[in-house]
Design a protein with these regions (language model features):
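Conserved active-site and cofactor/substrate-binding residues in soluble primary-metabolism enzymes
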Residues: 10, 30-33, 53, 57-64, ...
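Substrate-binding/catalytic subdomain of NAD(P)-dependent oxidoreductase enzymes
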Residues: 1-28, 33
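ATP-dependent carboxylate/acyl-activation modules
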Residues: 25-83, 87-100
Length: 180
């Protein structure tokens, strides 16, 4: 999912896997369809939805655009800008960007492992919204966690802490989409 958001007076942009709740309009996008979900003060929430293109039509369109732009530059007919308004905006820092996260781990299935996780999260002031444990391979358990909203900086500290733990494997850490 590609996401761009204004955070305070900064902007955050990202592209990557995101868990989308079944209740979110983006969860209805299926197969080769694409969607753009926009939230704005004047329009509220809107979604533009339609068929996407396969790899060959997309490549053909991109190549055609590149050829047209190159040709226009060489001929000196690039035209005038529609709008030359500009406003400098800086990227948000990891301390400013907040999201809930889904974290999946494999841990030794023994006493004290859940306590270690709780201490790690407590040390970075992050909290669990949902946590489940299921059996994995012999002697190990799979822990699935959904956190309350926390910063990217907190997530990085959690990931660093997990790397220090013997026999703990981080399988995934994905944003969870909560708006919509």
């Amino acid at each position: 999912l590609g996401v761009a958001e204004k955070v305070n007076d900064h902007i955050t942009v990202s592209v990557g896997p995101v868990l989308v709740p079944q209740t979110h309009p983006l969860a209805t996008v299926i197969n080769e369809n694409n969607a753009v979900f926009v939230t704005g003060v004047a329009v509220g929430e809107t979604m533009f939805y339609g068929p996407g293109a396969g790899e060959l039509p997309t490549a053909n369109s991109v190549l055609s655009d590149i050829i047209s732009v190159t040709k226009n530059i060489v001929m000196g007919i690039t035209g005038n800008s529609f709008n030359d308004y500009s406003h400098e905006i800086k990227l948000a820092t990891p301390d400013e960007v907040k999201n809930p996260y889904y974290i999946s781990l494999i841990v030794p299935d023994k006493t004290g492992e859940m306590l270690k996780l709780t201490e790690l999260f407590t040390n970075v002031e992050a909290s669990f919204k949902l946590i489940t444990q299921t059996e994995a391979n012999e002697g190990f358990a799979k822990i699935s966690i959904v956190t309350h909203a926390m910063t990217e900086a907190q997530l990085l500290k959690i990931e660093e802490g997990l790397k220090q733990e013997k026999d703990v494997e981080l399988l995934a850490a994905y944003k969870v989409l909560e708006k919509g």
